[in-house]
């Protein structure tokens, strides 16, 4: 597991606005974890640890919350922050079972310079994300699509995407166009 995905956390037993302010004054962020049919867990996370890693997170980044005894597999559901001061007020995490496959939309990242575009063709992107199915820890943050070999008049379909091992398409029609060059 990448260390950049692991966040240390501690349980908290005090709640409410004044307690949240007290937590933030100690350079910690109040947070909750829900999902998996469990009760809501109230946590606090070190601000500096979260802020260092937060810029690298996407909607598909699976994080591991580690309290020293148990590791929870979570996604960030919501981050409440003051836009002017960049102070994070609160984080909501959604817990998933790391042993159960899930379906999630993943962005398609276009790379390379297409031969067809170099020849004067116009690239049209028809699909910016794709629904995939995998275990949470295998979920990619994006799917790369190399445009280098795509010629003028060609299309790339969902079935042409190169998916990481342990990841498969969850779309109904694999013959949908992702990009076309005309």
UniProtKB/Swiss-Prot annotation:
Biological processes annotated in GO: translation
Its recorded name reads: Large ribosomal subunit protein bL25
Tell me which Pfam families the record gives. Answer: Ribosomal_L25p, Ribosomal_TL5_C
Could you name the Gene Ontology cellular component terms for this entry? cytosolic large ribosomal subunit
Q: Does the keyword Phosphoprotein apply?
A: no
Task: Give the record's family classification.
Answer: Belongs to the bacterial ribosomal protein bL25 family. CTC subfamily.
Gene3D superfamilies associated with the record: Ribosomal protein L25, beta domain (2.170.120.20), Ribosomal Protein L25, Chain P (2.40.240.10)
Per its database record, what is this protein's job? This is one of the proteins that binds to the 5S RNA in the ribosome where it forms part of the central protuberance.
What the entry lists under HAMAP family is as follows: Ribosomal_bL25_CTC (MF_01334)
Tell whether Transit peptide is among the UniProt keywords: no
Q: What high-level taxonomic lineage is stated for the organism? A: Bacteria, Pseudomonadati, Spirochaetota, Spirochaetia, Spirochaetales
Describe the subunit structure. Part of the 50S ribosomal subunit; part of the 5S rRNA/L5/L18/L25 subcomplex. Contacts the 5S rRNA. Binds to the 5S rRNA independently of L5 and L18.
Source organism, top-level taxon: Bacteria
Q: Which InterPro entries match?
A: Rbsml_bL25/Gln-tRNA_synth_N, Ribosomal_bL25/Gln-tRNA_synth, Ribosomal_bL25_b-dom, Ribosomal_bL25_C, Ribosomal_bL25_long, Ribosomal_L25_dom, Ribosomal_uL5_bac-type
Give an example GO molecular function. Answer: structural constituent of ribosome
Per UniProt, the keywords (alphabetical) are: Ribonucleoprotein, Ribosomal protein, RNA-binding, rRNA-binding
């Amino acid at each position: 597991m990448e260390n950049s995905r692991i966040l240390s956390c501690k349980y908290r037993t005090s709640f409410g606005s004044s307690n949240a302010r007290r937590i933030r004054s100690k350079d910690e962020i109040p947070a909750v974890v829900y999902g998996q049919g469990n009760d809501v867990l109230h946590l606090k996370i070190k601000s500096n640890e979260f802020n260092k890693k937060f810029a690298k997170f996407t909607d598909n980044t699976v994080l591991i919350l580690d309290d020293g005894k148990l590791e929870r597999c979570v996604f960030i559901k919501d981050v409440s922050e003051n836009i002017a001061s960049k102070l994070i007020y609160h984080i909501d995490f959604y817990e998933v079972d790391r042993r159960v496959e899930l379906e999630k939309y993943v962005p398609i990242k276009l790379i390379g310079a297409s031969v067809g575009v170099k020849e004067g063709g116009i690239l049209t992107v028809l699909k910016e994300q794709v629904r995939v199915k995998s275990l949470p820890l295998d979920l990619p943050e994006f799917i790369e699509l190399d445009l280098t070999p795509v010629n003028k008049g060609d299309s790339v379909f969902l079935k042409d995407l190169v998916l990481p091992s342990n990841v498969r398409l969850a779309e109904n029609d694999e013959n949908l166009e992702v990009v076309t060059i005309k």
